[in-house]
Amino acid sequence: TFVGNIVDHKILSEYFSKALVCISPGQAGLGVLTSMANSVPFITRRDAITGGEIFNINSSNGVIYDSIDDLISLICDISDNRDKYIKMGRNARNYYISCRLPEHMVNSIIDSIDYVLRK
């Protein structure tokens, strides 16, 4: 069901609580981290538009695929192996908590600024 743009995090969390995966073939932006924060693995195409968020996806917390045939196979796998993707969602949440909280990103920016200032 297409519901349009949702900016309210409570409503968004309700949708994520019912989702097994989040599939976004053409975009891998902030939705990657939002999905991971909600224990939902993110699935996208290798050439998706991204601001770098796609680099957070690895085989234990999401899937990056190459072709429409890969996506078809992936959807079949999701249907046949639900527990695999539930585990992947837990891994996504753990990754988010350990590496991608806003505090982690702020510290990375501070470290980058400090590095440049030392040069």
What are these regions (language model features)?
Residues 1-6, 59:
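Nucleotide-activated donor-binding/catalytic signature segment of Leloir-type glycosyltransferases, i.e.
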Residues 9-13, 30-33, 48-56:
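Short glycine/proline-enriched, acidic/aromatic patches that form the donor-sugar handling elements
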Residues 14-27, 40-41:
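Acidic donor-binding loop of glycosyltransferase active sites
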Residues 82-114:
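A charged, aromatic-enriched C-terminal amphipathic alpha-helix characteristic of glycosyltransferases
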Residues 41-49:
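Short hydrophobic beta-strand element within catalytic cores of glycosyltransferases
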Residues 6-10, 29, 68, 78:
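Structural motif corresponding to alpha-helix initiation and N-cap regions
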